[in-house]
Regions:
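Buried hydrophobic packing segments
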Residues: 30-31, 116, 120, 236, ...
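Short amphipathic alpha-helical interaction/hinge segments
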Residues: 142-145, 254, 258, 302
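A glycine-rich phosphate-binding loop feature that marks nucleotide/adenosyl-phosphate handling sites
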Residues: 191-195, 264-269, 315-318
């Protein structure tokens, strides 16, 4: 994402600060679950100490990662620096319980699922609001006549409200698809190496997922299956196509020879450095252009489904860009 096309609320979800805060919470919840379980040696007092002292800084994590070339190890190392800072030399370090029995994928995939739900909640609210606006405008223009066109040629009369009505229904379908994708994506997995729970009790997964508002994966490997992420990206692609269709109609209606409708043009806005009379549909054009990115990223999501055996990381770099 680039700041020009990113709203602050959405951008904040994908900032390292937010990701590491989610990582921290997952690790703290896992410690509390282990203490509740009482099998590995961590006490509730240990878990409380860890929660009270755990912290990180993005700069320090980045500094450590430059050496380790492993983001999770860098994060855990920085957390341990805070957790153990007040422990006298020679005493056992509480940080030894952090990440106990977990893999990097247990942490990263569960956190990514949570980030996806955060992002989809914003998108769903916007799609719902836009659909309701289109519905309201459909009734507002239910008696406004306009020309219906097929193949771009005048066909029969219709009412302008029909356009808004069709958009409202399309957005309702988009909302349904996105909600279904959210439910599929809201899944966590803390199942240890290759997903066998050999190093961690399933109770930890259940505990963490419940606290995070996620559903435990009924059978993961060492990673969450990427068909979940692909469904999200495909739902976003269809939604983007719907928005592109609406924006394209606006662009066509704003043509100088048609001028049936136009997007707002605020005071002080300029349309051209050479032709001051121009009022261009730049917002609609931007929607059409950015829709191409979303649709292309859906292919990335589909390609990420096929991984080697119980995991590889061929999906990781692609997701850092596409998601």
């Amino acid at each position: 994402m680039i700041s020009r096309y990113t709203r602050p609320a959405m951008g904040a979800i994908w900032e390292l600060e937010n990701k590491f805060n989610i990582w921290k919470e997952i690790e703290l919840l896992a410690c509390e679950a282990q203490a509740e379980l009482g099998q590995c040696g961590i006490t509730k007092e240990d878990a409380k100490w860890i929660r009270d002292h755990a912290n990180f800084t993005v700069d320090r994590v980045s500094e450590i990662e430059a050496v380790t070339n492993h983001d999770v190890i860098a994060f855990l190392t920085n957390m341990a620096e805070y957790i153990d800072a007040d422990i006298p030399e020679g005493e056992e370090k509480p940080s030894r319980w952090v990440h106990y029995g977990m893999t990097s994928s247990d942490l990263g995939d569960t956190a990514l699922s949570y980030q996806i739900t955060q992002a989809l909640d914003i998108i769903l609210a916007d799609v719902k609001q836009l659909g309701e606006t289109c519905k309201r405008r459909a009734f507002e223009f239910q008696d406004t006549l306009c020309v219906g066109r097929t193949h771009g040629i005048h066909a029969e009369p219709m009412v302008f409200g029909m356009k808004f009505g069709s958009w409202a229904w399309a957005l309702k379908r988009a909302e349904t698809r996105l909600q279904q994708a959210r439910e599929v994506a809201a899944t966590g997995a803390i199942s240890g190496a290759v997903g066998t729970y050999s190093s961690i009790d399933p109770f930890v997964e259940q505990y963490v997922c419940e606290k995070m508002g996620l559903t435990p994966d009924p059978l993961s490997t060492q990673v969450l299956a990427r068909d979940r992420h692909a469904q999200v990206m495909c739902a976003l692609a269809v939604c983007a196509s719907t928005l592109e269709s609406i924006a394209l109609q606006v662009r066509l209606m704003q043509e100088s020879d048609v001028i049936e409708a136009e997007e707002p043009f605020k005071a002080g806005q300029k349309g051209s450095s050479a032709m001051p009379h121009k009022r261009n549909p730049i917002t609609a054009e931007r929607v059409c252009g950015l829709a191409r990115i979303v649709k292309a990223n859906a292919q990335v999501g589909l390609d990420d489904v096929a991984l080697w055996f119980e995991r590889d990381i061929s999906h990781s770099g692609a997701e850092r860009v596409a998601l």
